């Protein structure tokens, strides 16, 4: 149990554990500290002091909690990020910065991941209980930090740069997760950067008063603007860490991969990166606009107004100043507790940061013409199946019996229904659950991946597509090659030999 439990406790994105068999000292090693001065870097804001991280092969220079923008507080809440503030003395960069405001409760996804590993029920419950009782990392609105790891501190060494944007449905996650602190990528001559960005209502809330207060007449998409600010900072400063500002690859998984596609769709990010990797995510599905609703769902601005009014935080006509005066805890608690706004705060087509829906920009050949690598996992839907069966604003009840489910299926898919039923084996009771989960994964990830890949290929641009099929090793596992299963392989941060 405890070998599998350790894997889960460490890999589930928040707990700090040292990988077995990798012998990495996450702090300044004794040998290095007695021989070497801590690594230094001169950036536009001042001088940074990092730490040496010892591996089996060499020393890596690590800089943590580096500000790439001013704290988004006060008048900068729900505003484009401002330039980072300078400092006069040498600044310590050995500790991670706070993660952005988000729920710290255990997600249904995480529970499904634990139970899908094939553990006996008592052991699975012990892992879930341990995860649920953990102390969450520090959290703050002041969270616009990035972390860098490099193998060569020679300025202008021109090492390739990879910039990681984490997943988490645009609602959770942090750049400081142990899973993303790779040493293998830097050992191969890559400058690795992981960056935070604002989440949930702090990152994607829209409101007419905020739009009116904005110089470009828009609101929402602050998380995308944070990512763009991080890329601008990298352009200005990465040479100090041995990186090449003309060879920057952006990559991410799930919402982080969607963020990559959003950056490809934003003219504000043009020239700030040169290649893109998307792992299980392309943001071609979201239909809501800043001022445009969809099939009875209101626009992003109306959703923002309703969020404040229905939770007693502000009136429908509140000013931008009144909204910015609301406490961050009150905003976060309302977003977590009011299920009417679950998943309501997402990137939107605002006509500026996102000129149109990502889907339309892909079809109109207006996404960035850079080389891309993208793909998805064989069992993307396995851990989301329970969510899929829950009632939503567009699906108020989910039939329990197979005949009723097939009738609903035929109603929704019309002429295509029989082909899909046969393709996924949905007419066989013993296969229905697995076929439906498989279809869910294709619908959520596969379709959007293939859409962008095909469109890119039609433009005769370099495109590479993969599918990840590695499954957990334990007999009895049901998660399969689940969502996010490839991440430890990308970063080589395995917590068990797999």
Task: Describe every region a protein language model picked out.
Residues 236, 262, 270, 275, ...:
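Substrate-access "cap/lid" subdomains that shape
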Residues 18-221, 245, 403:
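Non-catalytic accessory segments of hydrolases
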Residues 242-253:
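Alpha/beta-hydrolase fold nucleophile elbow
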Residues 5-14:
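Bacterial N-terminal signal peptides
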Residues 252-262:
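Glycine-rich nucleophile elbow surrounding the catalytic serine of serine-hydrolase chemistry
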Residues 216-239, 298-302:
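Alpha/beta-hydrolase active-site loop
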Residues 131-136, 216-221, 287-295, 349, ...:
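Active-site rim elements
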Residues 386, 438, 446-498:
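Mobile gating loops/cap/lid regions near enzyme active sites that modulate substrate access
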């Amino acid at each position: 149990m405890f070998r599998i439990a350790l894997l889960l406790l460490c890999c589930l994105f928040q707990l700090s554990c040292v990988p077995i068999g990798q012998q990495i000292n996450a702090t300044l090693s004794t040998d290095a500290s007695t021989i070497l001065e801590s690594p230094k870097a001169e950036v536009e804001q001042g001088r940074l002091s990092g730490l040496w991280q010892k591996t089996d092969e060499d020393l890596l220079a690590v800089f943590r909690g580096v500000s790439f923008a001013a704290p988004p507080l006060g008048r900068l809440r729900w505003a484009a990020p401002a330039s980072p503030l300078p400092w006069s003395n040498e600044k310590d960069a050995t500790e991670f910065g706070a993660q952005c405001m988000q729920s710290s409760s255990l997600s249904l996804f995480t529970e499904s991941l634990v139970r899908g590993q094939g553990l006996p029920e008592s052991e699975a419950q012990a892992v879930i209980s341990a995860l649920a009782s953990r102390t969450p990392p520090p959290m703050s609105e002041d969270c616009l930090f990035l972390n860098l790891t490099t193998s060569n501190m020679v300025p202008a060494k021109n090492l390739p740069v990879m910039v990681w944007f984490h997943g988490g449905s645009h609602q959770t996650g942090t750049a400081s997760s142990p899973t993303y602190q790779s040493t293998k990528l830097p050992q191969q001559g890559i400058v690795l950067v992981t960056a935070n960005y604002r989440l949930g209502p702090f990152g994607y809330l829209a409101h007419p008063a905020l739009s009116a207060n904005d110089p470009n007449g828009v609101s929402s998409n602050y998380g995308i603007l944070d990512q763009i600010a991080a890329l601008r900072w990298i352009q200005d400063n990465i040479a100090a860490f041995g990186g090449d500002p003309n060879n920057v690859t952006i990559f991410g998984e799930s919402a982080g991969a969607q963020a990559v596609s959003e950056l490809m769709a934003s003219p504000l990010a043009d020239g700030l990166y040169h290649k893109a990797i998307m792992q299980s995510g392309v943001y071609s599905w979201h239909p809501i606009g800043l001022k445009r609703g969809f099939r009875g769902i209101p626009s992003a601005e109306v959703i923002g107004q309703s969020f404040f009014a229905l939770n007693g935080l502000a009136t429908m006509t509140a000013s931008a100043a009144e909204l910015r005066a609301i406490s961050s805890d009150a905003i976060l608690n309302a977003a977590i507790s009011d299920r009417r706004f679950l998943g309501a705060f997402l990137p939107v087509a605002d006509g500026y940061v996102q000129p149109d829906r990502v889907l339309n920009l892909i079809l109109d050949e207006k996404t960035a013409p850079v080389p891309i690598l993208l793909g998805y996992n064989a069992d993307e839907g396995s851990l989301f199946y329970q969510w899929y069966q829950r009632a939503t604003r567009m699906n108020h009840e989910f039939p329990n019996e197979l005949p009723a489910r097939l009738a609903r299926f035929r109603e929704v898919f019309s002429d295509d229904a029989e082909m899909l039923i046969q393709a996924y084996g949905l007419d066989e009771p013993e296969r229905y659950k697995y076929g439906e989960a498989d279809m869910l994964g294709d619908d959520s990830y596969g379709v959007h991946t293939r859409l962008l890949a095909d469109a890119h290929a039609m433009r005769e641009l370099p495109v590479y597509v993969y599918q990840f099929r590695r499954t957990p090793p334990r007999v009895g596992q049901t998660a399969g090659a689940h969502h996010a299963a490839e991440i430890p392989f990308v970063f080589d941060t395995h917590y068990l030999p797999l």
